[in-house]
Regions:
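C-terminal substrate-recognition regions of SAM-dependent nucleic acid methyltransferases
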Residues: 136-180
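SAM-dependent methyltransferase catalytic region
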Residues: 1-134, 155-169
Length: 180
């Protein structure tokens, strides 16, 4: 119903966006009364937390910028480019309430399990992972993605106690896998 939709948009959704173009798109979709802060998620925390009067979340969804100041990755690294997507994931995990969920779409390099971020993720329940190789990632983003493998993953903010569902591209189905 329209009443329920309005309640969800005005009382349950909070967005932080730095780009005015993207803010305008969100307002076109959700209306002018959407809770959206024109802020830098990482560097203006006090601003958006004050605007929303909230500092913990039940669910966080994101497709953060992967780099700033250019492209960085296998085969290409622009001078001055810095990878930043991991900072968004790391900070979002800190903002989750106990038993809250975090769903992100990022490069899949964390799945090599070598980084501090990967170690932090492994302390949580990884519910689901789906990987996209370079070719499929490129198609998925309508040929606008860089040449890197991507994945989306759902993390529950509690201790790992169950197997993780991993999408098997060969069999086209989710399989249970014990990551820990």
């Amino acid at each position: 119903s329209e009443k329920r939709r309005t309640h969800i948009i005005q009382n349950m959704l909070y967005m932080v966006e730095i780009s005015q173009i993207n803010i305008n798109k969100c307002k076109k979709i959700f209306g002018d009364n959407v809770n959206i802060s024109k802020s830098d998620f990482l560097n203006e925390t006090t601003k958006w937390q004050t605007e929303f009067n909230i500092s913990e979340f039940n669910i966080i969804l994101g497709n953060p910028p992967y780099n700033i100041n250019g492209m960085k990755g296998k085969g290409r690294s622009d001078k001055g480019a810095t990878v930043i997507w991991g900072k968004f994931v790391d900070y979002s995990l800190d903002l989750l309430k106990t038993n809250g969920y975090c769903l992100f779409f990022t490069p899949n390099s964390w799945t090599e399990l070598k980084s501090p971020l990967a170690k932090k993720i492994l302390t949580k329940q990884i519910v689901l992972i789906k990987n996209f190789d370079v070719v499929n990632a490129y198609k998925l983003f309508d040929k606008k993605a860089g040449s890197l493998p991507l994945c989306y993953y759902l993390i529950k903010n509690n201790k790992p106690s169950k197997k993780t569902l991993i999408y098997d591209n060969l069999f086209n189905k989710l399989i249970d896998f014990d990551i820990n």
